[in-house]
Amino acid sequence: EDGKRYEHRDEFFPTLFVKSKKKTKYKTLSGQAVEEIHPGTVRDCRDFYKKYEDIDNFEIYGNDRYIYQYISEKYPQDEVKFDISKIKLVTLDIETTSEQGFPDVESCVEEILAITIQDYTTKQIITWGSKPFKNDRKDVTYNHCPTEYELLTSFINYWMQDVPDVITGWNIQLFDIPYICRRLDRVLGEKLMKRFSPWGLVSEGEVHIMGRTHITYDVGGVTQLDYLDLYKKFTYKAQESYRLDYIAKVELGQQKLDHSEFETFKDFYT
């Protein structure tokens, strides 16, 4: 409002549908007549689903992704015009130790060594790192945090003061976001981990890709746009590898920092 970010809680009463014995203007895809019901708030609707989930032949219809219902009702126009400069979008990337091999989200035993975010609008970069670093760039702010506890504490304190609307980055949905959430929970506790969301709503889930189960985290109030998914969807060309190093070489002619002279990644970062 007036060019300033603000949060507002808007009460919303979703619409659901149930079978109707009378003729109505609403039908399911199979032709079944249905009528509107309004159980109440979003929480009331969820309770309504639970109440009748074990009742035979009692079907509940409608979009149970209530965020989309709200957007559809709030902005009925075909195209929603927006100013991207008013949307706080950041790119996020983390680096971890590799004491026991490549970091794994499920076990999440490797410590976080660095977290970097870049603001899409200002292009400013902020890094929290565990090693001393001599910074001579005006577009970079480096925060030296000797321990992971200090690093995560400093990061989440900053994050809570300026939570972005959108997070992007390469493979963030399957690695960076769930890894940060799990390390925050393990090192600082669940209460501070949930502050990763401006609403305090962080929930764990699973996705199944190519026969493998992956852990994901939904961060309420923050949209995750995984650059890997966007690249696959909008380039219309299959690549032999989707490792960031390979894609950077294909698209930019550049590669990640070479550390082949070291026997292990641990030798490189220590």
Residue ranges and their predicted role:
Residues 1-230, 234-270:
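The two-metal-ion catalytic cores of nucleic-acid processing enzymes
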